[in-house]
Every structure is written in structure tokens, then in C-alpha cells.
From Swiss-Prot:
PANTHER family: HEAT SHOCK PROTEIN 70KDA. Residues 596-609 have a biased composition (Basic and acidic residues). This is Chaperone protein DnaK. It comes from Streptococcus agalactiae serotype V (strain ATCC BAA-611 / 2603 V/R). Signal peptide: none annotated. It comes from the Bacteria. InterPro entries: ATPase_NBD, Chaperone_DnaK, Heat_shock_70_CS, HSP70_C_sf, HSP70_peptide-bd_sf, Hsp_70_fam. Acts as a chaperone. The keyword Phosphoprotein applies. The modification Phosphothreonine is found at T173.
Length: 609
């Protein structure tokens, strides 16, 4: 069975890992980095992903960042003169990760385990699956990020029982999961979180502070200047990272804008104390989900054995201190917060292929599921933190006499009223025989699969008529749209491969021209005029082809030059070899001559005493 890669598709950074033997290994990207910025930019018809896209974000308005925050919504982003769904942009990131994983493995990759925040709802999970499909990946499993982290942490600890709290603060989302580990079983007891809290929010606090201070000093609002705003974002992210290691950092942005008197520069120092003050409310928001998860799991703090920190934002000192204060425990630092999720996803891939034995993952649904009933009430069928996969049925009836149909409004959330929860979908069960209210028996069944994706059916127990719906992400992507996006993604991959081939050919041409010119110079006056002239002629032809930019012509002329240059190099080698042989012959003769002038050799005799 081919390898199943593990992908952590993050808000700010993504990572890909693979199982090698029993070890989960992070695959470095083409720039040698173990994580890849989740950034996509468009330039001259080319799609650029990762580090290169992030570097040009300041100057290129066609750059998309933090697309994960829009997953599961119908919101689109404009770039490159087109509108893209969040799934399409995410697919470009996935395709890039898939591409360099294939380069590393030396084989095609068709399957992946992709992680999502534990608190992602059904629409967001479905959108992630769609993104994988567009990227040409069969998504074998959607795994919650804290669960994947626990899997990576606990793989070598299957011989002991422990309860762990995973505190996962990423670029755009926050999750807390409590798991029980023992005998190879990873059992999620409870999960809680906030899909609108992450490192981006900490950056935004710094940006708002810088904008406000600059406006006070110069009367100019930098938030209205798109390019200045991108520079501020980069500076804020850097300052945040700096303040994890030092107590004060300098923010210096020359020529940030221009005033009536000329160019203006932003120079400001930011202390850790000020940063902590700016972000105090964000840190406070992490405490409620911790308490909620503990309460749902029915555990006290004293029963938690380890606290695992996941996500780059857990490096913020104030966050670490808040975790210590809230749990009364020193966080376990045995895992890399940026890499552990992808590594856990790769381990789950190994479980699916059978390469990892005796490991069972029992995950939960993060939010309650149910339907709208009379009076706009939300009636739960499946409570949050129920182990998945699961199925649950309940019988309802009509609200009016002779009601011919019932509308099934499927919801996800925790609020008592339907209007306050997330709509997953609606469908109708029709042709209900005329009867007084309360008589027809309508059985509603919810199914949640191992990926946390929901399907619902309604059945009239009197007529056995049934209606079924698989909840689609409310981005509204049909199978046809996904297929079209897949074809577009494949076409882009082919175009990218062709562009790479062009660049490689041009580099080869440059190299061949340089090497041949060097050889021609070195062979001047050495008597290889025929070969030198042939090489020079082929070199001139290649230079003409290079100027024309005709790739086929360049390829043909490069082959011709390589042939002539090789013939010249052979002559040069033969001459060097002959000279070396002659020199060795002369040394041998001289050595023999000096030996003949020495004393004659005489056999000696000796007598034992």
C-alpha cells in the first residue's frame, strides 16, 4: 500500500510528515524549512505558495493569507482578477505540500490524513475534505489537531495510563482536548475551543497599537494604506516572536508613508510588559475552554498527568504563564509545537495502512447536533463530546392537523434556541398521510462518521417513506464544481512543471556556455584548432538560440554544443595524460640511472654462535 502522508493545514503555517518505519518524520520544503507559510500569491499567471509567496506579500496585492479562517463559509477572495473559494486556495497549499512530499519519497502520493481544529464544525470539515479532493488527494481521515498531537506525544508511552490536556493555540484557532491514554487506546474525553482566537489576533493587537501611536504623532491613518498594513503585519509578527525571547524589541519601518513634508518613518520600541497588557483579554479567553473541557470530562486538575502545548502561539510567555496558573502544572515541552500535529497525522496514516499496530483512536464530536422543533427550539439528538462514529435516532410528530410535509432543519451548537446555532442544512419529508397532529411518527436519525461529517435521514414510520441528506459545506460546492477545480489544479500543476523545465533548461544553457568558453580559452595555442573551431561554432549557435528564447531550438543546440565540447575536452584530457606519462617515464629513467651508480649488492654469510 502506498504511503499516506500526514498534513497539518494551518492558518499561518502548514507541515507535512510521513511514517518511516515506526518513526514519524517531518518533510522539509524545497527551501529547507520544516514548516511552510500558508500563503498563496499570483504573479504573471504563476501560482506561488509558501516562503516565496510570503516574501512578496508586501509588494504583491494578489497575495492570500490565513485562508483557513474562511473555510466552511461562502466567502470568496479576489486575486489575479478572479474570485477563489477558500477550498481552492487551500487546495493550492495542499498541492504544494503534496508535491514536495512526492519529491522526497520518490513516488506519487494520492492519500492523506488532514488535521482540523477540534472545534471545526461540519461545514468546515467538509470544506477541508473538498480542498483535499481538489488537490488530487484522497482524504483518508480528518483528525482533530489536539488528538493528532496526543498521538505523536503518546506513541512511545503506550505501556502506561495517563490523562493529558492538550492546549492548542495556533495561528487562527484555539482548542483544548482532554484524552486518556492507555494500552494503545487514545480516548478523547472532551474537547472545547474558540475558532476565532489565535496568533493572528495577537498580531492584530500590535498592529492596532502601532496604527494608533503613528496617528497620534503624524495624523495619518496607516490602516487605510494596504501596503503599509502588510508591512505592519510582518513587523507585528516579528515583534511577537522576538518578545518570546527578549523583554524589549525595536520596530523600525522606514518610509512607511509620506506626509506633506516628505517621507515618514515608523520607529517604536515595544516591551513585553506592554505586549502582555495589549493582549491580556486574548489570554483571558483561553481560560474558559480549559475549564469547560475539564468539566465535560468530569475531571479535576489533580487528575491531569501532563499538559501538552501545541501551536506556535504557545511560545508567548503570557500564554505559558496562564496555562501554568490555570492547570497548576508545568507544561510538558517534549514535543515541537509546530510539528507535532503533522507527525500525529502521519501516525494515523500508518494506523490506516497497518504499519502502526495496536493503536486505537477514539475521537469525539465537538458540538451538539439536533433539529429545530416547535417554537424555534433546538432539540439535541447527539450531545457534544460523544465518541465518533455514532448514530442516534429520535421519533417526532407533526405540529398541525393533516400536515402533508415536515421541514427538517439540521443544526449544530449549544444554544437552546435554533436561531442561535449553526445551520448545517434543511430538507423536507413529504407525502405524509392526513392525520391529526401528533399521530404521524417521524423518525429522525443522525449519523456522524469517523471524520466528524454528518448525514441525516427522516423516515415516516407509517409509510416507510424516507428522505436522506449528507450535509454539504455551506460554501455550496457541487461535485461538478469540485471536479472542475480538480482539473484546474491539475492544469496548474502541469503549467508549473513546464515552467520548472524551462528554468532548468535555461540554467543548463548558461552553465554550458560558461564551461565551453572556459575550455576554449584553456586550449588556446595547444593545437586543437579543428575541435576548438567546432566547439566555438556550436557555442555561437547556442547563444543565438538563447537570444531567440525558442526552447526547442535551445535544447537541440545545447545537445550539439555538449557533443563538440566533449570532443574538445577529450583532446585536452589526452594531451594532459600523455604529458603526465612522459613525465613519469623521465622520472623512472632518472631513478634507474642513480641506482646503477651505487654499490654492488653482495650476498652475506653469518654463523650462529
Amino acid at each position: 500500500m502506498s504511503k499516506i502522508i500526514g498534513i497539518d493545514l494551518g492558518t499561518t503555517n502548514s507541515a507535512v510528515a510521513v511514517l518511516e518505519g515506526t518513526e514519524s518524520k517531518i518533510i522539509a520544503n524545497p527551501e529547507g524549512n520544516r514548516t511552510t507559510p500558508s500563503v498563496v500569491s499570483f504573479k504573471n499567471g504563476e501560482i506561488i505558495v509558501g516562503d516565496a509567496a510570503k516574501r512578496q506579500a508586501v509588494t504583491n496585492p494578489d497575495t492570500v493569507i490565513s485562508i483557513k479562517s474562511k473555510m466552511g463559509t461562502s466567502e470568496k477572495v479576489s486575486a489575479n482578477g478572479k474570485e477563489y473559494t477558500p477550498q481552492e486556495i487551500s487546495a493550492m497549499i495542499l498541492q504544494y505540500l503534496k508535491g514536495y512530499a512526492e519529491d522526497y519519497l520518490g513516488e506519487k502520493v494520492e492519500k492523506a490524513v488532514i488535521t482540523v481544529p477540534a472545534y471545526f464544525n461540519d461545514a468546515q470539515r467538509q470544506a477541508t475534505k473538498d480542498a483535499g479532493k481538489i488537490a488530487g488527494l484522497e482524504v483518508e481521515r480528518i483528525v482533530n489537531e489536539p488528538t493528532a498531537a496526543a498521538l505523536a506525544y503518546g506513541m512511545d508511552k503506550t505501556d502506561k495510563d495517563e490523562k493529558i490536556l492538550v492546549f492548542d493555540l495556533g495561528g487562527g484557532t484555539f482548542d483544548v482536548s482532554i484524552l486518556e491514554l492507555g494500552d494503545g487506546v487514545f480516548d478523547v474525553l472532551a474537547t472545547a475551543g474558540d475558532n476565532k482566537l489565535g496568533g493572528d489576533d495577537f498580531d492584530q493587537k500590535i498592529i492596532d497599537f502601532l496604527v494608533e501611536e503613528f496617528k497620534k504623532e503624524n495624523g495619518i491613518d496607516l490602516s487605510q494604506d494596504k501596503m503599509a498594513l502588510q508591512r505592519l503585519k510582518d513587523a507585528a509578527e516579528k515583534a511577537k516572536k522576538d518578545l518570546s525571547g527578549v523583554t524589549q524589541t525595536q520596530i523600525s519601518l522606514p518610509f512607511i508613508t509620506a506626509g506633506s513634508a516628505g517621507p515618514l518613518h515608523l520607529e517604536m520600541s515595544l516591551s513585553r510588559a506592554k505586549f502582555d497588557d495589549l493582549t491580556r483579554d486574548l489570554v483571558e479567553r483561553t481560560k474558559t475552554p480549559v475549564r469547560q473541557a475539564l468539566s465535560d470530562a468530569g475531571l479535576s486538575l489533580s487528575e491531569i498527568d501532563e499538559v501538552i502545548l501545541v501551536g506556535g502561539s504557545t511560545r508567548i510567555p503570557a500564554v505559558v504563564e496562564a496555562v501554568k496558573a490555570e492547570t497548576g502544572k508545568e507544561p510538558n515541552k517534549s514535543v515541537n509545537p509546530d510539528e507535532v500535529v503533522a507527525m500525529g497525522a502521519a501516525i494515523q496514516g500508518g494506523v490506516i495502512t497497518g504499519d502502526v499496530k495496536d493503536v486505537v483512536l477514539l475521537d469525539v464530536t465537538p458540538l451538539s447536533l439536533g433539529i429545530e422543533t416547535m417554537g424555534g427550539v433546538f432539540t439535541k439528538l447527539i450531545d457534544r463530546n460523544t465518541t465518533i462514529p455514532t448514530s442516534k435516532s429520535q421519533v417526532f410528530s407533526t405540529a398541525a392537523d393533516n400536515q402533508p410535509a415536515v421541514d427538517i432543519h439540521v443544526l449544530q451548537g449549544e444554544r437552546p434556541m435554533a436561531a442561535d446555532n449553526k445551520t448545517l442544512g434543511r430538507f423536507q419529508l413529504t407525502d405524509i398521510p392526513a392525520a391529526p397532529r401528533g399521530i404521524p411518527q417521524i423518525e429522525v436519525t443522525f449519523d456522524i462518521d469517523k471524520n466528524g461529517i454528518v448525514s441525516v435521514k427522516a423516515k415516516d414510520l407509517g409509510t416507510q417513506k424516507e428522505q436522506h441528506i449528507v450535509i454539504q459545506s455551506n460554501s455550496g460546492l457541487t461535485d461538478e464544481e469540485i471536479d472542475k477545480m480538480m482539473k484546474d489544479a491539475e492544469a496548474n500543476a502541469e503549467a508549473d512543471a513546464k515552467r520548472k523545465e524551462e528554468v532548468d533548461l535555461k540554467n543548463e544553457v548558461d552553465q554550458a556556455i560558461f564551461a565551453t568558453e572556459k575550455t576554449i580559452k584553456e586550449t588556446e595555442g595547444k593545437g586543437f584548432d579543428t575541435e576548438r573551431d567546432a566547439a566555438q561554432s556550436a557555442l555561437d549557435e547556442l547563444k543565438k538560440a538563447q537570444e531567440s528564447g525558442n526552447l526547442d531550438d535551445m535544447k537541440a543546440k545545447l545537445e550539439a554544443l555538449n557533443e563538440k565540447a566533449q570532443a574538445l575536452a577529450v583532446k585536452l584530457y589526452e594531451q594532459a595524460a600523455a604529458a603526465q606519462q612522459a613525465a613519469q617515464g623521465a622520472e623512472g629513467a632518472q631513478s634507474a640511472d642513480s641506482s646503477s651508480k651505487g654499490d654492488d649488492v653482495v650476498d652475506g654469510e653469518f654463523t650462529e654462535k
